[in-house]
UniProtKB/Swiss-Prot annotation:
Inhibits RpoS proteolysis by regulating RssB activity, thereby increasing the stability of the sigma stress factor RpoS during oxidative stress. Its effect on RpoS stability is due to its interaction with RssB, which probably blocks the interaction of RssB with RpoS, and the consequent delivery of the RssB-RpoS complex to the ClpXP protein degradation pathway. HAMAP family: IraD (MF_02010). Belongs to the GpW/Gp25 family. IraD subfamily. It is found in: Cytoplasm. One of its GO terms (cellular component) is cytoplasm. This is Anti-adapter protein IraD. It comes from Escherichia coli O1:K1 / APEC.
């Protein structure tokens, strides 16, 4: 009986792989926020309009939103090792958030900024 062996070469972790990982995570996060069938809780993906009856400057409400969003994103995106959610602006019909994260197999932090305006999420470039 003859044995056959197959050699498998694992891809090296290069800058391009890291870049494509980062792009992939950002693309998937934006899709998670933008999809009408998103598994995220409706309040987390539909922005501030749900808060019209509340005080948008309420720090407890903002903190609750950030904790809920962080928990949901960590559950749905397993490539994120660490995540911090920050509210940059919170108005009645506009919400700006910043996601600062560390990905597994990536040594550099990644910032992903989103703005809820006119009923949709828009990606913004970090400043």
């Amino acid at each position: 009986m003859m044995r056959q062996s197959v050699q498998t070469v694992l891809p090296e972790s290069t800058g391009n792989n890291t870049l494509s990982l980062r792009d992939s995570v950002c693309r998937d996060l934006f899709q998670l926020f933008s999809s009408p069938h998103s598994p995220l809780p409706i309040l987390l993906v539909s922005g501030m309009p749900e808060w019209q009856g509340h005080n948008q400057s309420d720090k407890l409400l903002q903190s609750w939103y950030c904790r809920q969003l962080r928990s949901a994103l960590l559950f749905h995106e397993p490539r994120i090792a660490a995540l911090q959610v920050n509210l940059k602006e919170a108005y009645c019909h506009e919400l700006a958030i910043s996601l600062e994260m560390m990905l597994y197999h990536d040594d550099e932090p990644l910032t992903f900024d989103l703005v809820w305006q006119k009923g949709n999420w828009h990606r913004t470039m970090p400043q």
